[in-house]
Regions:
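Membrane-interface "cap" regions at the ends of multi-pass membrane proteins
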Residues: 1-61, 207-213, 232-242, 422-436
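Transmembrane alpha-helical segments of multi-pass small-molecule transport proteins
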Residues: 35-37, 108-109, 135-162, 176-186, ...
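Hydrophobic alpha-helical segments and their helix-loop junctions in multi-pass secondary transporters
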Residues: 160, 176-201, 216-220, 259-264, ...
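Membrane-interface loop-to-helix entry segments
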Residues: 147-188, 203-204, 244-247, 346-357, ...
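Hydrophobic, membrane-embedded alpha-helices of multi-pass small-molecule transporters
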Residues: 28-45, 187-192, 201-262, 278-297, ...
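C-terminal membrane-solvent junction of multi-pass transporters and transport-like membrane proteins
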Residues: 25, 319-320, 356-418, 422-436
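Juxtamembrane transmembrane-helix boundary signature
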Residues: 65-98, 107-117, 121, 421-428
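Membrane-water interface regions at transmembrane-helix termini and the short interhelical loops
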Residues: 53-54, 81, 97, 128-137, ...
């Protein structure tokens, strides 16, 4: 009987709407490893290749360190604590500040669609890599590329359809494979280009410091919202949540520099083209697929959770079905040429995620970390989010100033705090309950 009870306790609850019980919470290193897998993405290598073209190798050092240590670490720690404290996924936590209707049909949709976009981008890159292995010119033979992309996508999706427990074990062997890829990439770059040429490489100066930070943050800012999807399996203490982003920083910083070193002098951000130019062996492209697998799991799993919340799916079986259907739709996105629109996807994420995070952060701490499912639609959250998105858009495209994602998050948070405080005094309702 004792063994049966112990076995029952170790079974992971993966229902999208159910808080993870405290007796099933894990050591902080488990979600940290998953975060490392999330950060270990082909997209980050591509961003590194882009940044060295603008800044040179020495010039990207302050950009990378500031983004990861001052912004990414802090945002992830806060978001992670929210998930650990409540045991809930991000799209469910959002119900308190936004109201269940808004969280279902706007927040879950935004998170789900952008996660689909990221998944489609990296699956497209992997299709390119498989074509390189098979000696197929993926720029000409699109039928063969589509077939290889479908195969890669199906394999990518299987662990995320199964659930959290299989994702953890996949990362345990996929991350080392990605590290091997990077080591070989550095070796070939040094062999073909030479360290002196890499270190002295001069960037074009076409991208400002703030724009470089925004580019990196555009990829990572989604974590300010979705971290809770994985930290809900962790213990709810601040120490663990401060340590947990180590997985992101320890992988992200080196990976960006590796992408930069590999891309020096190549004149392209297409990582497959860069690898071909460097003379990567065939197995390197297979390892590229393995490295991409880690972040693909997170993108697909988050997409499934978000759409499950939107459709009010409450079982693990239902979540798995939703994730599988979402995978099919994501494959269709691959064939629309989303890889050529990577910068647009980064910009969209940089506009939407900070505004969502701003409301969620402030609402959570206004209520002192006590979560309650709020029915309806909180228009104060809508107003704050619109203000934040507007600030992000204006400072990105019209009056280019500062770091738009950070500004959007801060302005959204301040706006939400002020109008909720005023509403609590002037016209209190269920959304102002618990706000003093």
């Amino acid at each position: 009987m004792g063994k049966e009870l112990e076995k029952e306790k170790t079974v992971i609850i993966d229902d999208p709407m159910t808080p993870v019980p405290l007796n099933q919470r894990q050591h902080w290193t488990a979600p940290a490893f998953i975060f490392g897998g999330l950060e270990f993405s082909v997209t980050l290598l591509m961003i590194g290749s882009t940044l060295i073209g603008a800044f040179g190798l020495k010039g990207i050092i302050p950009v990378v360190l500031f983004t990861f240590i001052c912004l990414t670490w802090v945002g992830n720690a806060i978001s992670g604590y929210m998930g650990a404290k409540t045991g809930l996924s991000s799209s469910v936590i959002a119900k308190q500040g936004f109201g269940d209707k808004q969280a279902k049909f706007i927040i879950a949709l935004v998170i789900g669609v952008i996660s689909m976009g990221w998944w489609a981008v990296q699956t497209s890159v992997t299709g390119n890599a498989f074509c390189a292995v098979l000696g197929i010119d993926y720029t000409v033979n699109r039928t063969a590329w589509m077939i290889t992309t479908i195969v890669a996508g199906i394999v990518f999706a299987i662990p995320s359809v199964i659930g959290y427990s299989s994702m953890k074990w996949t990362d345990y062997f996929a991350v080392p494979g990605g590290i091997l890829l990077c080591i070989v990439g550095i070796y070939l770059a040094l062999k073909n280009i030479g360290w002196s040429n890499i270190i002295s490489y001069k960037g074009s100066g076409e991208i400002s410091f703030a724009a470089g930070v925004t580019m990196i943050l555009g990829m990572n800012v989604s974590q300010f919202v979705i971290s809770a999807d994985y930290t809900r399996y962790a213990k709810p203490c601040w120490k663990d949540n401060i340590l947990r982003p180590i997985g992101i920083v320890a992988i992200g910083i080196p990976l960006l520099f590796i992408g930069a070193i590999m891309g020096a002098g190549n004149g392209t951000a297409d990582i497959v083209a860069v690898m071909e130019n460097l003379g990567f062996p065939i197995w390197g492209f297979i390892v590229l697929w393995l490295a991409a697998w880690t972040s693909q799991l997170v993108n697909n799993y988050t997409m499934g959770l978000s759409f499950s919340n939107m459709l009010n799916i409450k079982t693990n079986k239902g979540r798995a079905i939703v994730t599988a259907v979402g995978t099919f739709l994501s494959l269709l996105l691959c064939f629309t040429g989303i890889l050529e629109n990577l910068q647009k996807l980064l910009s969209l994420a940089a506009l939407l995620y900070p505004a969502i995070a701003g409301v969620m952060f402030v609402d959570f701490f206004l209520r002192k970390g006590v979560w309650e499912d709020k029915q309806g639609w909180n228009f104060m959250a809508t107003i704050a989010m619109i203000v934040g998105i507007a600030v992000g858009y204006i400072t990105t495209y019209i009056v280019v100033i500062g770091i738009p994602p950070a500004q959007s998050l801060i302005i959204t948070g301040i706006t939400y705090y002020v109008i909720m405080k005023v509403k609590a005094k002037v016209a209190p309702d269920k959304f102002t309950e618990g706000i003093n």
